[in-house]
Amino acid sequence: MATSSFNINELVASHGDKGLLATALVDKTAHEQLEEQLQHQRRGRKVYIRNVLGVKDSEVIRNRYGGKYDLHLTQQEFAPHGLAGVLRLCETLDCLDSFPSSGLRQDLVLDFGGSWVTHYLRGHNVHCCSPCLGIRDKMRHAERLMNMRKIILNDPQQFDGRQPDFCTQPAEDCKVQAHFAISIHGGYDMGFRGLCEAMNAHGTTILKGTMMFDGAMMFDDQGVIPELNCQWRKIRSAFSETEDVTPLSGKLNSTVFSRVRKFKTMVAFDFINESTMSYVHDWENIKSFLTDQTYSYRGMTYGIERCVIHAGIMTYKIIGVPGMCPPELIRHCIWFPSIKDYVGLKIPASQDLVEWKTVRILMSTLRETEEIAMRCYNDKKAWMEQFKVILGVLSAKSSTIVINGMSMQSGERIDINDYHHIGFAILLHTKMKYEQLGKMYDMWNASSISKWFAALTRPLRVFFSSVVHALFPTLRPREEKEFLIKLSTFVTFNEECSFDGGEEWDVISSAAYVATQAVTDGKILAAQKAEKLAEKLAQPVIEVSDSPEASSQTPDDTAEVCGKEREVSELDSLSAQTRSPITRVAERATAMLEYAAYEKQLHDTTVSNLKRIWNMAGGDDKRNSLEGNLKFVFDTYFTVDPMVNIHFSTGRWMRPVPEGVVYSVGYNERGLGPKSDGELYIVNSECVICNSESLSTVTRSLQAPTGTISQVDGVAGCGKTTAIKSIFEPSTDMIVTANKKSAQDVRMALFKSSDSKEACTFVRTADSVLLNECPTVSRVLVDEVVLLHFGQLCAVMSKLKAVRAICFGDSEQIAFSSRDASFDMRFSKIIPDETSDADTTFRSPQDVVPLVRLMATKALPKGTHSKYTKWVSQSKVTRSVTSRAIVSVTLVDLDSSRFYITMTQADKASLISRAKEMNLPKTFWNERIKTVHESQGISEDHVTLVRLKSTKCDLFKQFSYCLVALTRHKVTFRYEYCGVLNGDLIAECVARA
């Protein structure tokens, strides 16, 4: 498994505006923390989330589903109540994952009220019951039809022969039978019992569903679900939120109200600060999911189990069982955590004090207000004076106060309509308490009774008091009016479930039957897969003929055009090949799919970054104009990406374009793509070469190759290029390299030219092979193969129809690494069929051999096998390595005869700036200053490694990077460094040599 790692400075320089966020992570623990996050993401299927989510919303979705799915938040588009939409998608996948996904008819899943187009596009084995209950449902159907057409037009081969599976009937009327069902926010209009009856009609035994949940609905008339930014409110009419004053006779005679649910309490769900459609549902149906537990219907007993309540969403399951159900007490609780700090206070709701209502007040506010009211009470004062005192204290405890110029919220604001009634209720409560306490004191202080009662011993007093209260209840003190009510933080529901459904359900026999059927179905599926694979492998391999006529008759030659997908049936797709019983075919197909997904994510990230810059500069997706503070925005982004720029419609650039740089694409309101000189658009560093989407598309259109992959794993300088030169046959071979520099080196070695037609025909980069027309060959020779993703290597073999690939590379040097730190890279490492080693170097001088051995001993884990522990050198140079400390970049000796390498882009930029200050030729700082990663595969006589900072850099601890740095030279190597860097592997080994 490949490990995804990255350097913070490279991240900042390559990720556009995201680099602004990354700079905050540059500290001593940043690398470890990000690695932990990557490990956390390595699980489950990938789920791409297009909706723009804030930081809090992103945390909600990651906390809920980040452990199950590999979530990719592309932040591409704004959507109404974005988090709710994202949760709905993940809830759908989560509920479907509870059931078998064989694709067989017996494993069909029903979806009550879901989106059929979601299942169609993802290929789910689901039948959707999507009834048209009103204009909203019909609007949704029209929109789904449009979305389906749009997506099919972009990829018709994928959906060829596939039909959407849905009906427009209510769930209880649909005749499709299935054992399993889901209901994603579809139970509001059916209720618990309605869902059970629908399950019975379909023969469904298990249903998983979700719904918005707030336990406070049992207590309050309105509230907020903060995670969803949703406000709910109980209303009395389907058309108005105020009480309907139409006379009863008028309602009964009204043709309008005869069609709506009259006299029922509805719950309206409104999304705060979003002027979008709300959802209105029957409170009785919603309440049933909170209170009901079992329901017996037509020989089946259905029980609901509330599984998870998170972020205002409750996941539940309903399971139906046949036969008799012995009596059993079923108990569950609905909790109200939001009211644990509150107390109920009864206040008058009418002037005659007959009607009262209960309001919630913070316990701290009421306690302090009542305490002051009791201490300041005086029965000789007018009631209004005492009323004003209470109102003043109540206001101070529930309003905004200013302290030292800072405004602070004290307590919680009270409804303006309840404020005076609350104060009046507290006054009545205080007066009543004083009157009752006075009566109690007078009764206790009565002369004859109190003296006689006091003369009794304590046991007699207790006994006498109990007898009197039991025999003469009217002698008790008058019961006080209940003003204060303690609010319970939960409510309990107990139900005795008992049902006589006839014969007892034989669970043991059912288990045996299910196991037998599952084995039979599994064998059928395996046989089908093996048969399809055998048919595929039975096709003969088409060898390349020397005859031009024979070559022209190759079936796919005329169809292979850059960017065009071949028509591959669903059964022959990469996805099908990943399930191949032939291990290497499955491995290669999986790697190709990962490579295609990786390139697609790079493209999506580029689009997301550019769209964000465009929007911040005042642009939108409709007009070709920018209206923001362009200089401020682009100066900010320029600090992390010097290639960020604006091309105006006049043809002028905001900043001078670096010499030799040509932007192939740009971004504006029409998206990312080629632009004309008369357009306004923006660019960044990813717009110079933007081929990720094309690479992804081409790779997905290919099939995993079945040819042999051989790897020559040689040490640095073992003569890999010489070996390629010696075995290359122009009639049957093509040479493929990982990058343009390696291709130029091989062309010079073979053809003494880097740009001749012959050299460019036979020596090409992997990207060039995939993106352009190329002849088919029987063998491909690959240089520096470790810099390629395994999936890209397989795609190259498939495109060239090669039956053999001979790959040269060093498995211990810098391997392919992801440019997107968030991508879960698992299958990038080359998996060869044959491997051979070469442990003799002809390039590295004699003193480099023990240095590399020492580095391997110090850097690699104990027990790790390394070919560098036994490598030898045939070089005649005996001493080549030196080092010296420098104070700054000005002391670096820049000489045109030397090749300069750095570990980081920042140090490289400093050296280039220094070279420009010294007026050195452009060819020097363009070709003679590279990073270690860029210099892999390069061979030079004199090399200088420069480190200009002593801040933490993990690259100096990695054996692969240090190995490449120390093995580029033939004659001399000089290490020039500023300050002491802890863990500097090269400095430690050079010092001990």
UniProtKB/Swiss-Prot annotation:
The keyword Methyltransferase applies. Residues 72-290 form the Alphavirus-like MT domain. Its main location: host cell. The keyword S-adenosyl-L-methionine does not apply. It comes from the Viruses. Keywords: ATP-binding, Helicase, Host endoplasmic reticulum, Host membrane, Hydrolase, Membrane, Methyltransferase, Nucleotide-binding, Transferase. Residues 544-575 are annotated as: Disordered. One of its GO terms (cellular component) is membrane. Residues 839-993 form the (+)RNA virus helicase C-terminal domain. GO terms for molecular function: ATP binding; helicase activity; hydrolase activity, acting on acid anhydrides; mRNA methyltransferase activity; RNA binding. Interacts with RNA-directed RNA polymerase 2a. This is Replication protein 1a. It comes from Cucumber mosaic virus (strain Iizuka) (CMV).
